[in-house]
């Protein structure tokens, strides 16, 4: 019997905390939320104050029994879940579900898992903050209402399996709108003038004209003016400047900087940060505060003075700009500022070092800079060239850390040679280069987080799940675009001669940027057209502010939900009744062969092109869009070319060979075999020779690798990874095996292990196993015949269960076959 029971969310956190507390304390984990809304129904009583119907998760029932047993005999129960709204809700659910008594239940919070933080929390317990609980409930219930009512509308009007959400749908809207801005952007060209000069000592000075010329003719005329010109320094201005360090990390700035510097995804950053927090290396990682505690300020100063000297220290208190940051007590920082690295795996070390450097730099002196601007004049015209230079006089915080930017082409100013006013310079060359205006860049995961934060949409705990959700739903994907080659012109004046050149550059290429899919664009347009309030950026931000007000006790959560729902629900009902289906259809033109309309739209299996209409006497012809094509951007010519598929390539060993595109991408068909093309391979460029190569590789891959009990064993790679196939049974191959070189012993081991597991699952069988009862999860049993499965009631006596009972249940479960009624031909 434990005198004190401490309940935290994760086992890793429990393990770390248990090291700091004595033998009188037992630290256990709730493994996250122990209750949630049901997955198969709304779970909210709309007519009774929006009361949630919380259910204990099936996988937590045994855990609840254990926790009840532990807490029933404990003198004190300490609820030590995280210090945010989710953590407060977990503490409340534990108190309610375990029926804890107020007199011996204490709520403790800490923003770092260190001995001093834990001991301090034990000394300063509090009660559950119901304002925070209600703020979490309001978010959970409102998001359930939106998702549960909007998603079925999408199933009826667009496609089954779709979903909508208050934050996720707005995030998709941002990405769709940015993509359309890029597609609609009209590029304008101008000519940028750059030059290179030298001093009498041969030192190089690079300069540029402050303005661009609109046309090539204007640029060439300017170069003509410089033929035979003499150049000198017109003016030289030197000014002191300083650079200040960035504040310590919040959740969003950590996600952004980890993406730029470490190339981590947002979800990876949060996973790694969670491990660092649970191991006691950093403070809590879901925060929008830039504050540092007095203890942190003091330890940071000590570390800076010890490492770099007193002159590098400058204690700073940063102001938190983000709304709703009242719950977060501190920025993300190391728990021990004297530790620059940790005993952990590579990714954890990388992120820790980033946090350590950023925190340390935030408490360091400004960098002192000397900026020099030089104007260079010519004797043949009134324009002047400008050269900029920068010299670091005192590096300050730059000794440790420099924040990255999203601008990949930002120019860095270098040092200039010593120059004097009136000094004569020799010109090496002057170049007029055609440059083009660029649209705003596509969002990265990190820049999307930044935009959501700027708009007040979401909170630290929601950024990563939102970005994961919109990708998992197939509304957005991280894509690599090859772009296209664009020519540009350049004129160079050197030795009093102007030389023209035509060069080329690749534009529109993007890697790892967020791009909307066709389904994402169609869903977005439907929601914007019919649910403009939900999709409004200001409304979404206003809802977040309401949650903040609830957390502060300034707003009633059920009244807030009632006000929202009375406006929202009637719109849902109206859209269900009065709107048609949405496919994102675009009419591209007329098929020259048939005279029928050529269009593109969203179909059951994705984007497709279509010749003709369903109402025509002649059935429409369909073709799938290729990877990289989009309903919004495909041209008439590109769509028409799709109908050249399938392409007949010839005959190989008496079997027809063709190339085509299907649900899962482009493929070569060889008889009845389907062979996928390599990623990025052009379906229109595949030759018969290439097809033969693929067929040969397929035959080799499908050849038996072994036999077992006289039956051949083959191998392959499927959706769930590598497998072997024996006797129509698929068996996954774990990583511990060398899949490329499986031995007979490996194969035998894999098959026998599979057979053993299958036999252990079967508790009763009839007709040589064609009808059987198998063990299922949670102590239940499943009756199986072929593909038909029936879950037996929990109180079923399997030992006494008869074949007749089994057949009766299976007959009841098997759907009756119905004869399709012949359709009546429409009258013309």
Give, region by region, the residue ranges found by the protein language model:
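Short acidic, hydrophobic short linear motifs in intrinsically disordered regions
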Residues: 233-236, 244-258, 282-287, 439-451, ...
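Accessory interaction regions appended to the cores of large information-processing enzymes
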Residues: 11, 29, 152, 169, ...
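A conserved hydrophobic secondary-structure block that centers on an alpha-helix together
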Residues: 255-257, 261-269
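Metal- or metallocofactor-binding catalytic centers and their adjacent structured scaffolds
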Residues: 214-248, 255, 420-426, 431-434, ...
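C-terminal or mid-to-C-terminal helical accessory/interaction module adjacent to the motor/catalytic core
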Residues: 113-197, 238-242
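Basic, low-complexity terminal or inter-domain segments flanking catalytic cores
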Residues: 2-4, 16, 25, 97, ...
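Intrinsically disordered, low-complexity regulatory segments
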Residues: 1-140, 149, 210, 309, ...
């Amino acid at each position: 019997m434990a005198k004190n029971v401490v309940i935290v969310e994760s086992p890793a956190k429990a393990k770390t905390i248990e090291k700091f507390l004595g033998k009188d304390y037992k630290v256990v984990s709730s493994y996250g939320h122990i209750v949630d809304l049901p997955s198969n129904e709304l779970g909210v009583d709309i007519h009774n104050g929006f009361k949630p119907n919380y259910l204990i998760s099936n996988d937590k029932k045994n855990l609840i029994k254990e926790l009840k047993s532990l807490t029933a005999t404990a003198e004190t129960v300490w609820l030590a879940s995280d210090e945010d709204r989710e953590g407060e809700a977990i503490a409340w659910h534990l108190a309610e579900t375990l029926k804890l008594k107020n007199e011996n239940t204490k709520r403790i919070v800490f923003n770092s898992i260190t001995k001093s933080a834990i001991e301090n929390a034990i000394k300063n317990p509090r009660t559950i903050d119901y304002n925070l609980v209600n703020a979490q409930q309001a978010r959970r219930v409102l998001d359930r209402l939106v998702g549960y009512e909007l998603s079925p509308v999408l199933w009826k009007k667009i496609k089954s399996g779709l979903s909508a959400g208050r934050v996720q749908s707005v995030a998709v809207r941002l990405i769709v709108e940015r993509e359309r801005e890029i597609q609609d952007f009209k590029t304008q060209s101008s000519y940028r003038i750059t030059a290179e000069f030298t001093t009498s000592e041969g030192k190089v000075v690079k300069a540029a004209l402050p303005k661009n010329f609109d046309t090539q003719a204007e640029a060439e005329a300017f170069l003509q003016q410089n033929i035979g010109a003499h150049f000198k320094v017109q003016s030289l201005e030197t000014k002191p400047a300083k650079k200040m360090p960035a504040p310590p990390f919040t959740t969003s700035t950590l996600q952004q900087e980890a993406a730029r510097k470490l190339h981590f995804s947002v979800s990876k950053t949060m996973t790694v940060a969670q491990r660092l927090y649970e191991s006691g290396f950093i403070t809590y990682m879901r925060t929008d505060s830039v504050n540092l505690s007095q203890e942190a300020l003091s330890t940071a100063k000590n570390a800076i003075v010890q490492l770099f000297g007193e002159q590098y220290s400058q204690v700073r208190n940063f102001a938190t700009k983000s709304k709703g940051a009242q719950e977060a007590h501190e920025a993300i920082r190391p728990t021990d500022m004297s530790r620059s690295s940790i005993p952990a795996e590579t990714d954890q070390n990388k992120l820790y070092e980033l946090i350590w450097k950023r925190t340390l730099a935030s408490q360091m002196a400004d960098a002192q800079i000397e900026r020099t601007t030089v104007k260079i004049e010519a004797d043949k015209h009134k324009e002047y060239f400008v050269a900029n230079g920068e010299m670091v006089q005192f590096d300050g915080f730059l000794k440790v850390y420099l924040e990255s930017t999203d601008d990949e082409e930002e120019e860095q100013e270098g040092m200039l040679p010593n120059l004097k006013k009136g000094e004569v310079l020799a010109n090496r060359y002057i170049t007029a280069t055609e440059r083009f205006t660029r649209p705003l860049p596509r969002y990265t995961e990190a820049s999307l987080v930044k935009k959501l934060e700027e708009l007040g949409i979401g909170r630290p705990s929601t950024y990563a799940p939102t970005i994961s959700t919109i990708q998992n739903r197939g509304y957005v994907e991280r894509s690599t675009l090859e772009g296209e080659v664009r020519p540009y012109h350049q004129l160079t004046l050197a030795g009093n001669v102007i030389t023209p050149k035509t060069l080329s550059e690749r534009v529109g290429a993007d890697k790892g940027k967020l791009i909307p899919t066709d389904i994402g664009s169609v869903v977005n347009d439907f929601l914007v057209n019919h649910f403009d309030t939900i999709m409004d950026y200001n409304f979404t931000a206003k809802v977040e502010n309401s949650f903040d007000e609830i957390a502060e006790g300034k707003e009633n959560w059920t009244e807030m939900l009632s006000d929202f729902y009375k406006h929202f629900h009637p719109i849902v009902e109206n859209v269900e009744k009065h709107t048609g289906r949405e496919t994102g259809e675009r009419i591209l033109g007329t098929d020259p062969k048939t005279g029928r309309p050529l269009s593109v739209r969203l179909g059951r299996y994705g984007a497709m092109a279509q010749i003709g209409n369903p109402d025509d006497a002649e059935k429409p012809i369909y073709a799938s869009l290729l990877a990289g094509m989009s309903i919004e951007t495909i041209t008439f010519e590109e769509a028409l070319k799709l109908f050249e598929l399938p392409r007949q390539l010839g005959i190989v060993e008496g079997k027809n060979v063709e190339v085509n595109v299907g649900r899962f991408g482009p493929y070569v068909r060889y008889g009845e075999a389907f062979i996928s093309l390599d990623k990025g391979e052009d379906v229109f460029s595949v030759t018969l020779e290439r097809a033969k190569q693929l067929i040969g590789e397929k035959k080799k891959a499908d050849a038996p690798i072994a036999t077992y009990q006289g039956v051949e064993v083959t191998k392959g790679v499927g959706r769930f990874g590598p497998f072997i196939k024996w006797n129509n049974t698929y068996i996954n191959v774990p990583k511990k095996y060398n899949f490329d070189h499986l031995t007979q012993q490996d194969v035998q081991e894999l098959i026998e292990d599979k057979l053993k597991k299958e036999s252990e699952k079967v508790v009763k069988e009839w007709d040589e196993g064609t009808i059987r009862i198998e063990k299922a999860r949670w102590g239940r049993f499943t009756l199986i015949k072929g593909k038909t499965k029936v879950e037996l009631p929990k109180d079923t006596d399997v030992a006494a269960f008869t074949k007749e009972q089994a057949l009766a249940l299976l007959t009841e479960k098997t759907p009756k076959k119905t004869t399709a009624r012949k359709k009546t031909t429409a009258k013309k």
